[in-house]
Amino acid sequence: LAGVNSINWARVLAQIVYYFSSAVSLGAPSRKVGFTVPTGNFGDIFAGYIAKEMGLPIDRLVVATNQNDILNRCLTGNGYHTTEVAASISPSMDIQISSNFERALFYAYALDANEIAKLMDQLKQNGGFDITNAALSALSYHYSSGMATEVETSNTIERILSRSAQLLCPHTAIGVKVADDFRDHAVPMITLATAHPAKFPAAVKNCLLYTSDAADELCS
């Protein structure tokens, strides 16, 4: 509990707040809203699951990943099996062991701690594990998923900057791209912005076909 990283339970609890705040601003609880969350460690989107269980009318929670898409592969029925990590312009997602996904599995396996311990042992010993159909069904009930390639991420940064003068960090751009894939005009979709673009200046500038004054100012 000392480090305020994504596995810290206090951080997950704090993240619940902005699900309620943003949903209420768009009409909740009178209307449902959706959330797309760029994530590698599953902490931010797990906070959304808790918010949903607390009664927030969330239509869907969408996991957005980069090319290191172990979460997307898992949630689309291909098991949780690690592969070699490929360096990307969204480095916070360049992982294969998602530290908070164990918490989601715990609920998907009906609070069976012994079964989760076995899965974690398989992950340690064999680099992955398969998920039962029942658990996958439970996960799919709460979570959808999608991914964005490097080119799609760069194109999204460029498109949003050109259209609205908003400069996105690569992780947020992945969320926006995946949110577009899941867009339902009857239900508003909120994409969580995970970092300021100035945190990744080289990656952001390399994504742009041109360097705007806004990009220079924000990334300097």
Per-region residue spans from a language model:
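Structural motif
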Residues: 1-2, 33-34, 59-62, 165-166, ...
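Glycine-rich phosphate/pyrophosphate-binding loop at beta-loop-alpha junctions
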Residues: 34-122, 192, 197-208
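A broad detector of short, well-ordered amphipathic alpha-helices
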Residues: 46-49, 173, 213
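A generic alpha-helix structural signal
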Residues: 157-161, 204, 211
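Extended hydrophobic-aromatic, low-complexity segments
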Residues: 168-170, 186-189, 200-203
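Single conserved hydrophobic/aromatic residue that forms the stacking wall/gate
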Residues: 210-219
